[in-house]
């Protein structure tokens, strides 16, 4: 038994010895009558205590008039009362020492201020008792046949029991996933609807499923992550335990994000921040809702994809091309068999009608012969040419769905390579039979490819190396103003944390500008100095390649241009050394409900045009390490520009990594004091010459 009190409570939720049903009904057609009916139907062996002052009995169970009358403290209570009365029952349950209550009522934080106040009242009433919900559909322990839910999706006589644990912030989606899994023969272990998460939330159940021996894969339907640090800790623990997480995050569009907020009353982070969170924690993001179960099904087999070479075995050429194309789009390879494999295949079948020496391997109508199929499978599974196998079921799957299943199932123990199936026709029976036989079957070529991609993600992902960024203890910022900093002030801040910045002088007159240019030497850059104008070039506030002889006149012209564009005559300027050579990058920070992220991408005036950027969330403490900084840079499409693209000189990547680490350390150390910050451009010079911040903005509180 775990010594963690929360783990013990969730263990009781999954497998309670007794259940109280507050507001129970004797009518199994009603929502209030279903929990008791489902518990009986699926053979629950524990005690059931219905509570309803209007009834003496519900079936064989005595019905109690109130919570105080219960014969013992239940492990779990299901509260079926409306939002206006649920908190009273919760308070009474807490008073008798009930470990946990499931509150189904809606009308809480998802409805606005009044509902939020009601939700706070519910939290206060619970005291130390744990709450699942409100606005939840409950949970189901399919492993042990324990139903703590009134969902109509649970009317089925037999649950599809397997190794996928599902946590959803939507109760309705939970029922949808159960029915979809059952229809395709895909087994699940646990189903949990967290919904408003007044107490127990997503991360708590990730931890619980990591500890659950029946669960191999964790599938999440996410509307918002309310506690990012807890989520990160739980997700990394799952990966260390060898239990991959697949997540479908709603809210990728503005409309979807607004709908998610209105559904649970939680602030949603930006979608790209979720990409960063998932990437850093090894969570596989399902791009389509159907991928959530598809990828999970492949991972639940426990088979490992060690390479990207896929054999396609088909009896229909068109479907083989579909699968090959879908795999190619995700960077998988479908090579022809090696000479020995091709010879072994040709020895099994003769005639021009077969295409056994290419990939897809097309057995045509001979695929209907189980003996031949069995022999071909053995050859392909043993072949060094392939890391995995896709079997395509053609029209034979409609009339005789069991035809291929037996042969495939017999061959599976011969190899630990992943084997997936694509069902080309509409053949639900074939899908179910193959999936139950240990071969996840998919109804689209794209889903099959996505499943392989999920398996490859698990194999390739490595936990981030924990590094401590160089500390800059005692960095003084009290001399800098609060609010938006001008460029000179922002670069003072950056340089104090270790980012090299351009040499520059502040001027107000043409004469001062000329003196500054001569002092710096060579052509210079003349800039407007302002804390309110961010995009200086848009208002005529930047001039490059200006000589000392030209700079005075150029300053006067800039005054006129800026005044015309903004309505205000400027009186402060920067004369700055020109940086030549290298490539321009953007290095910034972004604050979000999910946390603070560091952004790296192609910079200069094209930054917003190309939008080639990478994000990394800061860890709980400290900045990013060099390994994470390098991973950021290498993930960009423009990484080759740093790495000697087409004979160009290699850039000073080490200096760039130092700058990323320093900048992130600044964001971590200043915390809430730093509202935003950005360097654009950050010049990354040729190897050995370092980097140089040529412009930047920052805002301090």
Walk through the language-model features, giving the residues of each.
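Catalytic-core regions of core metabolic enzymes
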Residues: 1-701
């Amino acid at each position: 038994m775990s010594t963690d009190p929360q783990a013990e409570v969730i263990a009781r939720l999954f497998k309670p010895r007794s259940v109280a049903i507050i507001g129970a009904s004797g009518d199994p057609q009603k929502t209030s009558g279903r929990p008791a009916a489902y518990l009986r139907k699926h053979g629950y062996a524990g005690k059931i205590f219905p509570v309803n002052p209007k009834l003496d009995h519900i079936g064989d169970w005595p019905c109690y008039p109130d919570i105080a009358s219960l014969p013992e403290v239940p492990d779990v209570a299901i509260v079926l009362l409306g939002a206006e009365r649920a908190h009273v029952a919760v308070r009474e349950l807490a008073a008798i020492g009930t470990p946990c209550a499931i509150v189904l009522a809606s009308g809480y934080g998802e409805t606005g201020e009044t509902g939020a106040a009601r939700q706070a009242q519910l939290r206060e009433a619970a005291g130390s008792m744990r709450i699942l919900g409100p606005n939840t559909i409950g949970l189901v322990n399919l492993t042990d046949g324990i139903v703590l839910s009134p969902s109509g999706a649970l009317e089925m006589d037999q649950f599809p029991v397997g190794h996928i644990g599902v946590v959803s912030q939507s109760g309705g989606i939970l029922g949808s996933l159960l029915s979809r899994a059952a229809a395709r023969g895909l087994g699940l272990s646990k189903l949990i609807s967290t919904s408003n998460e007044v107490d127990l939330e997503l991360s708590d159940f990730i931890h619980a499923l990591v500890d659950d021996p029946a669960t191999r894969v964790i599938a999440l339907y996410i509307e918002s992550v309310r506690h990012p640090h807890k989520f990160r800790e739980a997700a990394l623990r799952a990966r260390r335990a060898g239990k991959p997480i697949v997540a479908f995050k709603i809210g990728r569009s503005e409309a979807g994000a607004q709908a998610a907020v209105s559904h649970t009353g939680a602030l949603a982070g930006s979608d790209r921040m979720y990409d960063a969170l998932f990437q850093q924690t090894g969570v596989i993001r399902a791009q389509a809702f159907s991928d959530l179960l598809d990828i999970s099904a492949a991972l639940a087999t426990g088979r490992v994809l060690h390479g990207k070479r896929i054999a396609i075995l088909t009896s229909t050429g068109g479907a083989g091309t579909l699968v090959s194309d879908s795999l190619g789009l995700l960077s998988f390879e479908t090579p022809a068999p090696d000479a020995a494999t091709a010879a072994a295949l040709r020895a099994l079948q003769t005639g021009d009608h077969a295409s056994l020496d290419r990939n897809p391997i097309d057995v045509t109508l001979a695929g209907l012969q189980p003996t031949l199929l069995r022999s071909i499978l053995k050859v392909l599974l043993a072949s060094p040419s392939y890391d995995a196998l896709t079997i395509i079921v053609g029209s034979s799957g409609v009339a005789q769905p069991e035809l291929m299943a037996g042969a495939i199932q017999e061959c599976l123990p011969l190899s630990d390579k992943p084997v997936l199936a694509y069902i080309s026709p509409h053949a639900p029976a074939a899908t179910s039979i193959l999936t139950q036989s240990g071969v996840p079957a998919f109804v689209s070529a794209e889903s099959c490819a996505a499943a392989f991609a999920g398996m490859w993600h698990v194999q390739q992902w490595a936990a981030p190396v924990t590094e401590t960024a160089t500390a800059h203890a005692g960095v003084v910022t009290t001399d800098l103003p609060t609010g938006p900093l001008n460029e000179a002030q922002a670069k003072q801040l950056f340089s104090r944390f270790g980012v090299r910045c351009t040499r520059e002088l502040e001027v107000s007159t043409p004469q001062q500008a000329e003196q500054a240019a001569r002092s710096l030497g060579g052509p210079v850059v003349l800039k407007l100095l302002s804390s309110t104008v961010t995009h200086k070039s848009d208002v005529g506030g930047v001039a490059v390649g200006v000589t000392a002889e030209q700079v005075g006149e150029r300053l006067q012209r800039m005054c006129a241009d800026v005044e015309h564009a903004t309505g205000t005559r400027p009186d402060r300027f920067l004369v700055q050394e020109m940086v030549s050579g290298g490539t321009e990058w953007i290095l910034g920070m972004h604050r979000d409900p999910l946390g603070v992220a560091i952004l790296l991408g192609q910079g200069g005036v094209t930054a917003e045009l190309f939008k080639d950027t990478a994000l990394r969330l800061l860890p709980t403490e400290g900045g990013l390490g060099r390994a994470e900084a390098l991973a950021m840079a290498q993930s960009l499409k423009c990484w080759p520009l740093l790495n000697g693209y087409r004979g160009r000189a290699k850039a000073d990547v080490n200096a760039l990594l130092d700058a990323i680490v320093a900048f992130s350390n600044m964001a971590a150390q200043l915390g809430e004091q730093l509202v935003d910050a950005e360097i654009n451009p950050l010049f990354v010079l040729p190897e050995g010459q370092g980097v140089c911040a040529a412009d930047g903005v920052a805002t301090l509180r």
